[in-house]
Amino acid sequence: MEYFLRINGKLDNLNDYTSACRTNPYKGAQMKRKNEAKVITAILEQLKRLRIKKPVYMVYDWYEPNKRRDLDNISSFGRKVIQDALVETKVLTNDSWRDIVGFQDNFYIDTGNPRIEVTIKEVEKTNER
């Protein structure tokens, strides 16, 4: 089974988060909560009360307004926030190796409509890692 989640706009990146944490640990925590709240809102609207019990493979399509931000900075913090929000809303049981077997990042430019599209694919259990 496949599920789709769309998050409009963009999330803060790893450089923003690292800078906030260096300024003040509370500021970093506040930034993470703000980003998670945005993702949780999208999850509650689109995935409703979905509960996935099988392991998943996740595909992230990042649509940026331009090429200013480094790819790894966009995806690293963004994946963390999205996966934590999926666990917080109980869509996923956990974000461990057993629950998320892998992921893929794709990057695109869409100047008028930045967004993140996440495809969550259930997979059959593989050998324990």
Task: Give the ranges of each region predicted by the language model.
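Catalytic phosphate/metal-binding cores of nucleic-acid and nucleotide-processing enzymes, i.e., regions
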Residues: 1-129
